[in-house]
Amino acid sequence: AGRGARVALSARSVDKLRALAIENALLLPCDATDTASLATARASLLAAWRGIDLVIYLAGDYVPMRAADFDLAVAERVVTVNFNGAMRLAATVLPDLRAGGGIVFVASVAGYRGLPKALAYGPGKAALIHFAECLHLDLAPQGIGVWVVNPGFVATQLTAKNDFAMPALLTPGEAALATVDGLKTGKFEIHFPKRFTRVMKFLALLPYGLYFPLVRRLTGN
């Protein structure tokens, strides 16, 4: 909004949307895990603006989890928000996207490869990256953009659950600016901060025989 865009915001709580105090923003409360709720928000948006230019899926959940405390119900909830919700959004808005517009999925570098404590979080983010890649192959020839954002650590209520030092930690504002700047490049993947994500990309290239022992050593696990 600060750069002149007309913005619509969605979340389950309209009070949280109002608390953002973004001037002239259209508030569309909805639940990303509920198809009917997304359809209602879409109808309200089209009634107000007659079209959709760019959609960003930022909904996310995170619970640190390892095999010793694996909880299927919790893991399914996390995946439902992080991945299934993104598919629901895509199904809702794809008919409205036109050349010059597009859709952005916020995933994570945790989706590159398996990591300690990411038993519930990582798989959904990996699936989201794959989903975005498939959509890009289909939609790019039509002039419709698809982007995936893979941040490192961002200081939020979710990452506050971590009991370890988070390298290259960004504020939400810094992450938002990096995302907007990344969209200007036209590149499919937007990843930041580079000093951290480049390390993660290097690790992702390693064969398992090197990757597993190195990650255990780096994480103390």
Positions of predicted regions on the chain:
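Substrate-binding pocket helix/loop in short-chain dehydrogenase/reductase
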Residues: 66-67, 74-77
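Conserved NAD(P)H cofactor-binding loop of Rossmann-fold oxidoreductase domains
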Residues: 58-63
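C-terminal helical subdomain
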Residues: 148, 164-199
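Active-site helix of classical SDR
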Residues: 90, 124
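Residue(s) in the substrate-gating loop at a strand-loop-helix junction
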Residues: 108
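Conserved glycine-rich Rossmann-like NAD(P)H-binding loop of the short-chain dehydrogenase/reductase
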Residues: 5-18
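Rossmann-fold cofactor-recognition segment
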Residues: 21-36
